[in-house]
Regions:
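A domain-level signal for the structural core that forms small-molecule/cofactor-binding pockets
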Residues: 2-254
Length: 254
């Protein structure tokens, strides 16, 4: 099996080339660099938990997969792992590249799932809770798995938009499908739902196991992280907040 040759292109002064995107393929610049240049030109971030789908052109995800595979093969070689003679690791570089780009971190490279929003024709204004939603991510420090549960509380008003139950899970999966820090991920989920639904109140609670604690480091198998985001009426009304948290805790016990 052959792998693409990765050619770094530099300008005469040693800095990264900034030629127009149309010329990059001819110059042999890696697709990751082309994408990075578009993001920088738009003055946007590309942190680990940012979505960069708007800057990836048709066909470039396949190119990116090939580039990550080639670079991952270099990592395996640096770890002194024989990928030629060992049939168990012969395809590991490609498997890992596919896992990151198409599964674990696909929330970085895919656009936001389509979500149909419905008007609140019945003028619903009572507490709604969705959960537990199983969520999976990876910490951006060690790329170790994060696995947990998410609960979402919504206090709609007559002007709020409503979404289907499955869409809460799809949006959460999209946000969590990137290298994340849990407290930031929960805020991103809350921001997304707040923008789409415009409720009077929004609450998000997440409890998760972090493999960077159980699989490495202190190797504590029992620790969990729990954090919450409260917006609007959940922040202002202590009784509503207590009701939401009590119902979530009852569901945990059940």
């Amino acid at each position: 099996m052959t792998y693409p040759r990765i050619i770094a292109h530099e300008s005469p002064n040693g800095s990264d080339a900034t030629a127009p995107a149309a010329d990059h393929d001819e110059l042999g610049v890696p697709v990751s660099q082309r994408i990075r240049e578009r993001i920088k030109a738009a003055q946007r971030r590309f942190h680990a938990n940012d979505n960069i789908a708007d800057f990836i052109r048709e066909g470039e995800r396949d190119e990116l997969l090939a580039e990550v595979e080639a670079r991952m093969r270099g990592v395996l070689q640096a770890l002194v792992i024989d990928t030629e003679s060992d049939h168990n690791t012969h395809e590991t570089a490609r498997r890992v590249a596919k896992m990151y780009l198409k599964e674990v971190f696909k929330g970085r490279y895919e656009r936001q799932p389509e979500v149909t929003e419905f008007p609140n024709v019945e003028h619903l204004n009572e507490l709604m809770i969705v959960g537990p939603i199983t969520v999976r991510s990876a910490c951006s420090h060690h790329f170790c798995p994060i696995v947990g549960k998410l609960w979402i509380g919504v206090m709609p008003n007559e002007h709020s938009n409503l979404i289907g139950l499955s869409k809460y899970a799809r949006l959460a999966e999209w946000v969590m499908g990137r290298p994340q820090i849990q407290e930031v991920a929960v805020t991103q989920v809350a921001d997304l739902l707040q923008t789409k639904m415009q409720p009077d109140g929004l609450a998000v609670v997440m409890e998760a196991e972090h493999f960077c604690m159980s699989w490495r480091g202190v190797r504590d198998m029992d620790s969990r992280m729990i954090n919450s985001v409260m917006r609007g009426s959940f922040l202002k009304d202590a009784n509503l907040r207590r009701e939401f948290l009590a119902l979530v805790n009852d569901r945990k016990k059940g």
